[in-house]
Regions:
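Short loop/edge segments at beta-strand edges and connector loops
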Residues: 7, 80-82, 213-215, 221, ...
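Glycine-rich FAD pyrophosphate-binding loop
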Residues: 20-45
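Dinucleotide-binding Rossmann-like beta1-alpha1 core, especially the glycine-rich loop
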Residues: 46-131, 143
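N-terminal Rossmann-like FAD-binding beta1-loop-alpha1 element of flavoenzymes
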Residues: 2-28
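Conserved flavin/dinucleotide-binding core of flavoenzymes
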Residues: 305-435
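Conserved Rossmann-like nucleotide-cofactor binding loop
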Residues: 11, 34, 249
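Mid-domain catalytic core of redox enzymes
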Residues: 22, 218-323, 328-337, 341, ...
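Active-site/ligand-binding neighborhood in enzyme catalytic cores
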Residues: 108, 117-220
Length: 435
């Protein structure tokens, strides 16, 4: 069977892996010059490892991607260090990645810290998220944490992540999933995520699949014979089935044959973009903290400062100390228009708040990465709004991170989504009468 896949990120490659292993003729179309999607990386000439453009890590609970890695025989190439995550309060950073750390956090009274611990324990132990999607995270957390703890700790994080305009939108099931799945140890692949993606792509092409890089799909049409025509700028070809892993808006734009109701579902899904500045410094910026959570109202020009080399040794990056300055923003935000030099002028002065001795001469090199589609916004009762993977067009499937729910988007659930779509294709066409 001829199967097309749009997108060579974790979802698309996972689907291609399963379908090529089943003997199908698979063609993957990818608009970017490399595989990996949002998990793709880059490499300076003097580095031993690649580095993710947008910071990534795995949790020890990420069964889908760790299971795939085990299938491939690469488990010995996965590392799980335990870095330090910190919360900003009153000009200082405090560890905030364990029950003991929360009890020591000075930003709220001790009784509220205990209350936070009880709520976190409840969220970790309760198995059902469905009742939680009926209420906003703002309302639920304010009620059960109490106003002091919520205003100090979690409201600034929610506003930073989704924006003030979405504070009354994001549902509590999303927050439950963040707590439920989180582990203190964070995983990565030796050599970086790009090495993993490249190795997976080689396995897929060794089975006869084709991966066409730098080839964005311009249109999908259903034909009278039941096949699907996939058009690129260079050519067009017919396929028996197609799995698209692109953004909902792009899916709607390139597939005019979708019914109006399904297209409306696609266009209703809200999401934010990501802007990430990566800096290579000649020395360590902070004293061992990996992830710095920054409340928006504290005046930082970005949401998170991640000192990657407090997690992975700078020896893998030629001695460079790697710092990410990142934010989730509406694609209309000025950060998507400003030049790298203009953003550096906004970002670099803020680094003095992490280290008063910081000097911009410490910066050896910088890179700017932007994506207009990076973070879905899950609204109240979001499960009712998610488009089905199996679209109303026969043989056409849609598997994107906007359908990952209630879990937060990431490579683990992208793998799960891609393999689920591949299984649907196999099952549907086994009957020779796909829906």
């Amino acid at each position: 069977m001829r199967i097309a896949i749009i997108g060579a990120g974790p979802a698309g490659l996972s689907a291609a892996y399963d379908l090529s292993r089943a003997g199908h003729r698979v063609t993957v179309f990818e608009g970017a010059p490399s595989v990996g999607g949002l998990a793709s990386g880059f490499k300076a000439p003097h580095w031993e490892w690649t580095l993710e453009k947008f910071y990534h890590h795995w949790f020890a609970s990420d069964a889908a991607i760790l299971g795939l890695i085990k299938e491939l025989g690469w488990s010995n190439e996965v590392l799980f260090p335990r870095p330090v995550t910190a919360m900003y309060h009153d000009g200082k950073f405090y560890a905030f990645d364990s029950a003991l750390a929360v009890l020591r956090f000075p930003g709220i009274p001790f009784v509220d810290r205990v209350r936070c611990g009880v709520v976190a324990l409840y969220l970790r132990l309760t198995p059902r998220w469905e009742p939680l999607e009926r209420v906003t995270a703002d309302a639920w957390l304010r009620k059960w944490l109490g106003p002091r703890a919520y205003e100090c700790m979690w409201k600034p994080m929610l506003v930073g992540k989704f924006g003030e305009e979405n504070l009354q939108v994001v549902n509590m099931a999303w927050f439950w999933a963040r707590i439920h799945a989180r582990t203190p140890r964070l995983g990565t692949f030796k050599g970086g995520f790009q090495v993993f993606m490249d190795k997976l792509a080689k396995v897929i092409t060794a089975r006869g699949a084709e991966i066409r890089l730098g080839t964005p799909v311009k249109g999908i049409e259903k034909r009278a014979d039941g096949t699907l025509r996939v058009a690129t700028a260079a050519d067009a070809a017919g396929f028996d089935a197609l799995i698209s892993t692109c953004s909902p808006v792009l899916m709607a734009d390139i597939t005019p044959d979708l019914p109006a109701a399904y297209t409306a579902q696609l266009r209703t899904l809200k999401s934010l973009g990501a802007v990430v500045m990566v800096l290579a410094l000649d020395r360590q910026l902070t004293n061992g903290i990996y992830w710095h959570n920054l409340p928006k109202d504290a005046g930082f020009p970005f949401l998170a400062m991640v000192e990657h080399t407090n997690y992975i040794s700078p020896a893998h990056y030629g001695g460079d100390h790697i710092v990410y300055c990142g934010d989730y923003l509406n694609p209309s935000h000025e950060y998507f228009r400003l030049a790298k030099e203009e953003l550096l002028e906004r970002f670099l002065p803020a680094l003095e708040r992490f280290n008063p001795h910081f000097d911009r001469r410490w910066v050896r090199q910088s890179w700017l990465w932007r994506s207009a589609y990076a973070q879905p916004v899950p609204s109240v009762n979001h499960s009712r709004n998610i488009p089905a993977i199996r679209t109303p067009v026969r043989g056409l499937y849609f598997a994107s991170m906007s359908q990952v729910y209630p879990w937060d988007r990431g490579t683990n659930f992208a793998v799960e989504m891609g393999r689920k779509a591949a299984k649907m294709v196999t099952a549907d066409f086994a009957t020779r009468d796909p829906p």
